[in-house]
Amino acid sequence: VKLVTQANAGVCAARNRAIAESTGDLIALLDADDTWEPGFLEEIASMAAEFPGCGIYSTAFNIVSHDGRFPAPTPTERGVVADFFRDSAHRYISIPSASAVPRAVFETVGGFPEGMKIGEDLYMWIKIARRYKVCFSPKPLANYSKVASNRSSAIYTPERTRYSFEELYDPAAADGYNEFVARAALGKALIISAKGGTKDAARAIRFFGYTKTYRRTLHKVRILNALPRSWRGPLIGLYNSLAWRIARKGL
Protein backbone atom coordinates (compact mmCIF):
# COMPACT_ATOMS: atom_id res chain seq x y z
CA VAL A 1 0.00 0.00 0.00
CA LYS A 2 1.34 3.41 -0.98
CA LEU A 3 0.02 6.55 0.73
CA VAL A 4 0.27 9.76 -1.32
CA THR A 5 -0.60 13.18 0.11
CA GLN A 6 -1.06 16.49 -1.68
CA ALA A 7 -2.72 19.86 -1.17
CA ASN A 8 -6.50 19.77 -1.53
CA ALA A 9 -7.21 20.50 -5.19
CA GLY A 10 -10.50 18.64 -5.51
CA VAL A 11 -11.55 15.06 -6.14
CA CYS A 12 -10.56 15.07 -9.82
CA ALA A 13 -7.00 16.17 -9.10
CA ALA A 14 -6.76 13.52 -6.36
CA ARG A 15 -7.97 10.79 -8.70
CA ASN A 16 -5.63 11.86 -11.49
CA ARG A 17 -2.69 11.86 -9.08
CA ALA A 18 -3.65 8.39 -7.89
CA ILE A 19 -3.89 7.16 -11.47
CA ALA A 20 -0.46 8.61 -12.24
CA GLU A 21 1.07 7.00 -9.14
CA SER A 22 -0.47 3.58 -9.76
CA THR A 23 1.32 0.86 -11.69
CA GLY A 24 -1.36 -1.68 -12.62
CA ASP A 25 -3.14 -2.08 -15.94
CA LEU A 26 -6.59 -1.91 -14.33
CA ILE A 27 -7.40 0.97 -11.98
CA ALA A 28 -10.16 0.59 -9.37
CA LEU A 29 -11.57 3.73 -7.77
CA LEU A 30 -12.84 4.01 -4.19
CA ASP A 31 -14.10 7.28 -2.73
CA ALA A 32 -13.95 8.13 0.97
CA ASP A 33 -16.78 6.58 3.03
CA ASP A 34 -17.59 4.08 0.26
CA THR A 35 -16.62 0.42 0.65
CA TRP A 36 -16.16 -2.79 -1.31
CA GLU A 37 -17.59 -6.15 -0.40
CA PRO A 38 -15.34 -9.24 -0.41
CA GLY A 39 -14.94 -10.46 -3.97
CA PHE A 40 -15.23 -7.06 -5.67
CA LEU A 41 -11.75 -7.03 -7.19
CA GLU A 42 -12.04 -10.70 -8.14
CA GLU A 43 -15.26 -10.01 -10.06
CA ILE A 44 -13.70 -7.01 -11.81
CA ALA A 45 -10.68 -9.10 -12.83
CA SER A 46 -12.95 -11.91 -14.00
CA MET A 47 -14.96 -9.57 -16.23
CA ALA A 48 -11.80 -7.99 -17.64
CA ALA A 49 -10.55 -11.44 -18.64
CA GLU A 50 -13.91 -12.59 -20.00
CA PHE A 51 -14.81 -9.34 -21.79
CA PRO A 52 -11.53 -7.69 -22.85
CA GLY A 53 -11.45 -4.29 -24.51
CA CYS A 54 -14.14 -2.57 -22.44
CA GLY A 55 -13.62 0.94 -21.11
CA ILE A 56 -15.35 0.48 -17.75
CA TYR A 57 -15.99 -2.60 -15.61
CA SER A 58 -18.70 -2.05 -12.98
CA THR A 59 -20.73 -4.00 -10.46
CA ALA A 60 -24.07 -3.43 -8.79
CA PHE A 61 -23.96 -1.61 -5.47
CA ASN A 62 -25.91 -0.69 -2.36
CA ILE A 63 -26.87 2.84 -1.31
CA VAL A 64 -26.11 3.54 2.35
CA SER A 65 -28.22 6.24 4.02
CA HIS A 66 -29.12 7.31 7.55
CA ASP A 67 -31.98 4.81 7.57
CA GLY A 68 -30.24 1.73 6.24
CA ARG A 69 -28.70 0.08 3.20
CA PHE A 70 -30.70 -0.44 0.03
CA PRO A 71 -29.89 -1.99 -3.38
CA ALA A 72 -29.48 0.57 -6.15
CA PRO A 73 -31.58 0.06 -9.30
CA THR A 74 -29.13 -1.60 -11.68
CA PRO A 75 -29.24 -4.03 -14.64
CA THR A 76 -29.80 -7.72 -13.94
CA GLU A 77 -27.65 -9.10 -16.76
CA ARG A 78 -23.91 -9.77 -16.61
CA GLY A 79 -21.77 -8.81 -19.56
CA VAL A 80 -21.32 -6.01 -22.07
CA VAL A 81 -24.03 -3.34 -21.84
CA ALA A 82 -25.87 -2.99 -25.15
CA ASP A 83 -26.29 0.79 -25.03
CA PHE A 84 -24.81 2.61 -22.06
CA PHE A 85 -26.55 5.92 -22.76
CA ARG A 86 -29.98 4.38 -23.27
CA ASP A 87 -29.69 1.85 -20.46
CA SER A 88 -28.48 4.48 -17.96
CA ALA A 89 -31.64 6.53 -18.37
CA HIS A 90 -33.53 4.89 -15.50
CA ARG A 91 -30.96 2.82 -13.63
CA TYR A 92 -27.37 2.97 -12.48
CA ILE A 93 -24.66 1.21 -14.45
CA SER A 94 -21.40 2.81 -13.35
CA ILE A 95 -20.33 4.86 -10.34
CA PRO A 96 -16.66 5.39 -9.41
CA SER A 97 -16.57 3.25 -6.25
CA ALA A 98 -18.12 0.27 -8.05
CA SER A 99 -15.94 0.51 -11.15
CA ALA A 100 -12.49 -0.08 -12.60
CA VAL A 101 -11.00 1.44 -15.74
CA PRO A 102 -8.06 0.11 -17.78
CA ARG A 103 -5.03 2.40 -17.65
CA ALA A 104 -4.93 2.46 -21.46
CA VAL A 105 -8.41 4.00 -21.49
CA PHE A 106 -7.36 6.92 -19.29
CA GLU A 107 -4.31 7.37 -21.50
CA THR A 108 -6.61 7.58 -24.54
CA VAL A 109 -9.47 9.79 -23.31
CA GLY A 110 -7.64 11.74 -20.60
CA GLY A 111 -8.19 11.95 -16.87
CA PHE A 112 -10.95 13.38 -14.71
CA PRO A 113 -11.90 17.04 -15.38
CA GLU A 114 -9.88 18.97 -12.83
CA GLY A 115 -11.70 21.97 -11.41
CA MET A 116 -15.15 20.47 -12.03
CA LYS A 117 -16.91 19.99 -8.70
CA ILE A 118 -20.35 18.78 -9.75
CA GLY A 119 -21.00 16.08 -12.36
CA GLU A 120 -17.35 15.13 -12.83
CA ASP A 121 -18.11 11.40 -12.68
CA LEU A 122 -20.72 11.52 -15.45
CA TYR A 123 -18.43 13.71 -17.53
CA MET A 124 -15.75 11.01 -17.33
CA TRP A 125 -18.14 8.14 -18.04
CA ILE A 126 -19.57 9.93 -21.07
CA LYS A 127 -16.10 10.40 -22.53
CA ILE A 128 -15.26 6.74 -21.99
CA ALA A 129 -18.60 5.24 -23.07
CA ARG A 130 -18.50 7.29 -26.26
CA ARG A 131 -15.44 5.30 -27.38
CA TYR A 132 -15.62 2.01 -25.49
CA LYS A 133 -18.11 -0.61 -24.41
CA VAL A 134 -19.06 -0.88 -20.73
CA CYS A 135 -19.18 -4.20 -18.87
CA PHE A 136 -21.45 -4.81 -15.87
CA SER A 137 -21.96 -7.42 -13.16
CA PRO A 138 -25.24 -7.59 -11.20
CA LYS A 139 -23.42 -8.76 -8.06
CA PRO A 140 -23.78 -6.01 -5.39
CA LEU A 141 -20.14 -5.75 -4.38
CA ALA A 142 -19.81 -2.07 -3.43
CA ASN A 143 -21.50 0.32 -1.01
CA TYR A 144 -22.08 3.97 -1.90
CA SER A 145 -22.52 6.41 0.98
CA LYS A 146 -25.44 8.74 0.31
CA VAL A 147 -24.69 10.34 3.68
CA ALA A 148 -21.25 11.48 2.52
CA SER A 149 -22.58 12.72 -0.83
CA ASN A 150 -24.96 15.10 0.96
CA ARG A 151 -22.19 16.92 2.85
CA SER A 152 -21.20 19.30 0.03
CA SER A 153 -21.37 23.04 0.62
CA ALA A 154 -24.78 24.68 0.37
CA ILE A 155 -23.24 27.85 -1.10
CA TYR A 156 -22.46 27.97 -4.81
CA THR A 157 -18.92 28.79 -5.84
CA PRO A 158 -18.39 28.97 -9.63
CA GLU A 159 -16.11 26.27 -10.96
CA ARG A 160 -12.69 27.26 -12.21
CA THR A 161 -12.25 24.74 -14.98
CA ARG A 162 -11.95 24.56 -18.74
CA TYR A 163 -14.21 21.52 -18.86
CA SER A 164 -17.98 21.55 -19.37
CA PHE A 165 -20.79 19.34 -20.61
CA GLU A 166 -21.28 21.74 -23.50
CA GLU A 167 -18.07 20.49 -25.11
CA LEU A 168 -19.45 16.93 -25.08
CA TYR A 169 -22.43 17.84 -27.25
CA ASP A 170 -22.01 16.46 -30.77
CA PRO A 171 -24.62 17.28 -33.45
CA ALA A 172 -23.38 14.31 -35.49
CA ALA A 173 -23.86 11.80 -32.67
CA ALA A 174 -26.87 9.55 -32.15
CA ASP A 175 -29.79 11.11 -30.30
CA GLY A 176 -29.32 8.87 -27.28
CA TYR A 177 -25.82 10.22 -26.70
CA ASN A 178 -26.81 13.90 -26.78
CA GLU A 179 -29.87 13.21 -24.66
CA PHE A 180 -27.68 11.65 -21.98
CA VAL A 181 -25.33 14.64 -22.11
CA ALA A 182 -28.36 16.90 -21.60
CA ARG A 183 -29.55 14.78 -18.69
CA ALA A 184 -26.17 15.04 -16.97
CA ALA A 185 -25.89 18.78 -17.59
CA LEU A 186 -29.43 19.58 -16.43
CA GLY A 187 -28.98 17.44 -13.31
CA LYS A 188 -25.91 19.51 -12.53
CA ALA A 189 -27.83 22.73 -13.28
CA LEU A 190 -30.48 21.71 -10.75
CA ILE A 191 -27.83 21.44 -8.02
CA ILE A 192 -26.20 24.69 -9.10
CA SER A 193 -29.52 26.55 -9.05
CA ALA A 194 -30.35 25.17 -5.59
CA LYS A 195 -27.03 26.57 -4.35
CA GLY A 196 -27.76 29.99 -5.88
CA GLY A 197 -25.92 29.78 -9.21
CA THR A 198 -28.70 31.43 -11.22
CA LYS A 199 -26.64 32.54 -14.24
CA ASP A 200 -24.86 29.23 -14.75
CA ALA A 201 -28.12 27.30 -14.40
CA ALA A 202 -29.77 29.62 -16.93
CA ARG A 203 -26.93 28.98 -19.38
CA ALA A 204 -27.51 25.23 -19.09
CA ILE A 205 -31.23 25.74 -19.66
CA ARG A 206 -30.51 27.61 -22.89
CA PHE A 207 -27.86 25.24 -24.23
CA PHE A 208 -29.54 21.95 -23.36
CA GLY A 209 -33.09 23.06 -24.11
CA TYR A 210 -32.95 20.73 -27.12
CA THR A 211 -33.71 17.68 -24.98
CA LYS A 212 -36.86 15.72 -25.73
CA THR A 213 -36.35 12.82 -23.35
CA TYR A 214 -35.66 14.94 -20.27
CA ARG A 215 -38.19 17.74 -20.67
CA ARG A 216 -39.36 17.17 -17.12
CA THR A 217 -35.89 17.84 -15.74
CA LEU A 218 -35.58 20.90 -17.97
CA HIS A 219 -38.86 22.33 -16.65
CA LYS A 220 -37.82 21.53 -13.09
CA VAL A 221 -34.62 23.57 -13.49
CA ARG A 222 -36.54 26.45 -15.09
CA ILE A 223 -39.06 26.58 -12.26
CA LEU A 224 -36.42 26.30 -9.53
CA ASN A 225 -34.24 28.95 -11.14
CA ALA A 226 -37.16 31.40 -11.22
CA LEU A 227 -37.73 31.16 -7.47
CA PRO A 228 -36.03 33.35 -4.85
CA ARG A 229 -32.60 31.94 -4.01
CA SER A 230 -33.46 31.45 -0.35
CA TRP A 231 -36.29 29.08 -1.31
CA ARG A 232 -34.35 26.83 -3.65
CA GLY A 233 -32.13 24.83 -1.29
CA PRO A 234 -34.88 23.87 1.18
CA LEU A 235 -37.31 23.12 -1.66
CA ILE A 236 -34.98 20.82 -3.58
CA GLY A 237 -33.94 19.19 -0.31
CA LEU A 238 -37.57 18.38 0.47
CA TYR A 239 -38.16 17.12 -3.07
CA ASN A 240 -35.11 14.84 -2.96
CA SER A 241 -36.09 13.50 0.45
CA LEU A 242 -39.58 12.60 -0.78
CA ALA A 243 -38.20 11.10 -4.00
CA TRP A 244 -35.79 8.94 -1.98
CA ARG A 245 -38.58 7.66 0.27
CA ILE A 246 -40.77 6.84 -2.73
CA ALA A 247 -37.91 5.07 -4.52
CA ARG A 248 -37.18 2.98 -1.42
CA LYS A 249 -40.77 1.80 -1.33
CA GLY A 250 -40.66 0.90 -5.03
CA LEU A 251 -43.50 3.25 -5.96
Indicate residue ranges for each PLM-predicted region.
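Nucleotide-sugar donor-binding/catalytic module of glycosyltransferases
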Residues: 1-158
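Generic macromolecular interface patches on structured domains
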Residues: 54, 135-138, 178, 199, ...
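Catalytic core of nucleotide-sugar-dependent glycosyltransferases
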Residues: 81-83, 87-88, 140-148, 152-179, ...
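TPR repeat positional signature
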Residues: 185-186
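Conserved small-residue packing positions in alpha-helical repeats and bundles
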Residues: 189-192
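Membrane-interface aromatic/basic loop that binds lipid-linked glycans or pyrophosphate carriers
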Residues: 197-251
